[in-house]
């Protein structure tokens, strides 16, 4: 609502300026757009169901309109996404893993194909980046890892090797994944497998102590050198 005010003198009319719009020449407010995206991506409520809910309240919105709002709202979030990518990479320590996700195939009604979430975690400031890619091929991580320098922690998937060998990158393994192999070895060589599992359990206890006491990164490093390194050696 924009109120108009006329001067008592009769000299002209004053009207408030329109608020800045999120979408150029569009009517949805920032709160409406954030609701649409939250409902869809956090609460798993597709846009067509949101359209039906609006209709029950007597608000008719064309499918093309609400879909256009969603698309343009996502475009407005791109600077935030780029900032998240930068923040996630900037500390020089990344933990990376990839996992499957079923994706609806727009060319085949009702059909799905298998896509991948590549997940990047920065343990220093706890930022997490979910990056969808249609494949598990190593090239899927190129836009994130090609210019990354620092500590890169992954499982044993061969796709990470080319990034771990880059200059300025120290490739770290993962004890959780390594532990699985010793569990598998219990049936073949129980004594040595149990020794390895017991040793890894000691490492976990040290990490638990660091977490429970909220140790700073430098203090964690000193703790690992003092307590964890002898266990590994």
Segments from the language model and where they lie:
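Catalytic center-proximal scaffold of phosphoryl-transfer enzymes
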Residues: 2-6, 11-233
């Amino acid at each position: 609502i924009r109120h108009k005010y006329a001067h008592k003198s009769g000299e002209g009319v004053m009207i408030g300026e329109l608020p800045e719009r999120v979408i150029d020449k569009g009517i949805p407010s920032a709160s409406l757009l954030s609701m649409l995206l939250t409902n869809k991506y956090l609460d798993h409520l597709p846009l067509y169901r949101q359209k039906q809910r609006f209709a029950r309240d007597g608000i008719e919105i064309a499918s093309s309109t609400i879909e256009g709002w969603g698309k343009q709202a996502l475009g407005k979030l791109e600077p935030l996404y780029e900032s998240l990518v930068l923040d996630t990479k900037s500390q020089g320590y990344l933990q990376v893993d990839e996992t499957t996700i079923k994706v609806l195939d727009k060319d085949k009604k009702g059909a799905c194909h298998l896509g991948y979430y590549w997940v990047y975690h920065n343990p220093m400031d706890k930022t997490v980046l979910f990056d969808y890619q249609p494949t598990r091929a190593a090239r899927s991580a190129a836009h994130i890892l090609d210019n990354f320098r620092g500590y890169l922690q992954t499982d044993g998937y061969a796709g990470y090797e080319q990034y771990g060998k880059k200059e300025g990158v120290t490739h770290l393994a993962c004890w959780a994944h390594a532990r699985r192999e010793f569990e598998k070895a219990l049936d073949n060589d129980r004594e040595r497998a149990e020794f390895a599992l017991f040793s890894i359990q000691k490492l976990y206890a040290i990490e638990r102590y660091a977490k429970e006491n909220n140790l700073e990164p430098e203090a964690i490093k000193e703790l690992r050198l003092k307590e964890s390194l002898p266990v590994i050696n």
